[in-house]
Amino acid sequence: MQKKIEHLTFFKQLKEDLQAAVDNDPAARNTLEVALAYPGVHAVWAYRLCHRMWNKSPLLKLPARIISQLTRAITGIEIHPGAQLGRRLFIDHGMGVVIGETAEVGEDVTIFHGTTLGGISMRKGKRHPTVGNRVIIGAGAKVLGPITIGDDVQIGANAVVVKDVPSCQVAVGIPARNRPAKNKQPHIDPAVSD
């Protein structure tokens, strides 16, 4: 599912992440404000650096983890350098977001604060979710285990998702239940829309 984005230059990736925040946050007034004052953007930028280090050499894994932990201390957002995150990821507000080592996230995904893409076991190997393209994950949602979230999915605020969610579905509740998406508007939390 995850496409390699190594063909993009590092700075092109950073620019795309910046533009994703500007495009997806109605409160964003300009790129300078976003570049200086958005912890979600800072965390994604630090991840991009750490991920390159993680994949470059075993000798760079420890420095990548250290930078990742410093970023967590500054932003409140924890992204493991081994995770695979697609282009134009937007983490809005961000405090309390956790993305585990084997998580895979597609392109044009929006993640709100308090979200966990976590594991449900301590075993080696794939233990975190795979998230498709154009997915919106509401505030406080927990997406747990080696499950697959399809493209164009909306996950409601505080949902606990422990089973696959097919494309073009909404997942809400504890445990989350899937239903067809009624609201096709981007960035509307399905937990509060009709």
Regions from the language model: what does each represent?
Residues M1-T71, T75, P186-D194:
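Terminal amphipathic alpha-helical/low-complexity segments used for targeting or macromolecular assembly
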Residues M1-D25, F90, G106-T110, G114, ...:
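Soluble, non-transmembrane catalytic domains of enzymes that act on hydrophobic metabolites at membranes
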Residues R29, R48, R52, R65, ...:
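Arginine residue identity/basic-tract feature
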Residues G40, P58, L62, H80, ...:
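Residues at secondary-structure transition points
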Residues T75, P81, G86-R87, D92-E101, ...:
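Left-handed beta-helix
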